[in-house]
């Protein structure tokens, strides 16, 4: 880019501002976390867009379609425990509420991993609308039916939510709690202290004016 210019004209070349690294939910995503090779779907329009094919699982989205159709019906407590990895769902639901993920809704903006043991794991995806003062969408998926149907599951969820709130946001000061420390640590990569101008300033000039 030219060292000087007038207004936005100096940013009209190949500079696109600050970008993030995105980890795709494919076989490498599973291997990095020590998870067995299984089907992974990005959920769009309630359909499963496959991102990974498990060697022992359906080569069509029939496993996702069956799970989706069944969780939208009333199911037994045992069905929920056998088909949805409840501890993962409790964490997924809690964290989405903490970070105000308002673009999440049923059929969109999340990923589902099908473990060969039969359990489904919801995974966050499309996280560009966080911590904003808007309702937009409900910020939940219909897996929440499990909590409404069974008080036992709702109590387990509330216990996990309380645990995460105490850990992450129990301290209301600007740099408090684990989440405040994490944000402070990460921000130093792009906005190191002691520098008069950083990449944050470049990004602000690129998009905010």
Question: What do these predicted regions represent?
Answer:
Residues 7, 60-61, 65-106, 110-209:
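Middle-to-C-terminal accessory/interaction subdomains
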Residues 2, 6-98, 102:
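Internal "kinase-insert"/substrate-recognition segments embedded within catalytic cores
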């Amino acid at each position: 880019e030219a060292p000087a210019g007038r207004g936005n004209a100096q940013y009209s070349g190949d500079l696109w501002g600050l970008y993030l690294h995105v980890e795709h939910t494919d076989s490498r995503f599973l291997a990095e976390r020590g998870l067995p090779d299984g089907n992974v779907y990005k959920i769009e329009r309630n359909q499963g867009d496959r991102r990974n094919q498990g060697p022992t699982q359906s080569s069509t989205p029939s496993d996702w379609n069956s799970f989706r159709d069944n969780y939208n019906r009333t199911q037994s407590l045992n069905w929920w425990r056998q088909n949805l990895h409840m501890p993962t769902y409790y964490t997924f639901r809690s964290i989405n509420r903490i970070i105000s993920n308002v673009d999440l809704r049923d059929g969109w903006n999340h990923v589902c991993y099908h473990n060969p043991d039969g359990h489904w794991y919801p995974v966050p995806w499309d996280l560009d609308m966080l911590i904003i003062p808007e309702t937009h969408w409900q910020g939940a998926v219909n897996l929440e039916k499990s909590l409404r149907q069974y008080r036992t599951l709702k109590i387990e969820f509330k216990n996990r939510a309380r645990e995460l709130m105490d850990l992450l946001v129990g301290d209301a000061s600007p740099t408090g709690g684990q989440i405040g420390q994490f944000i402070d640590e990460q921000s130093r990569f792009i906005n190191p202290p002691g520098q008069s101008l950083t990449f944050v300033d470049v990004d602000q000039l690129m998009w905010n004016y």
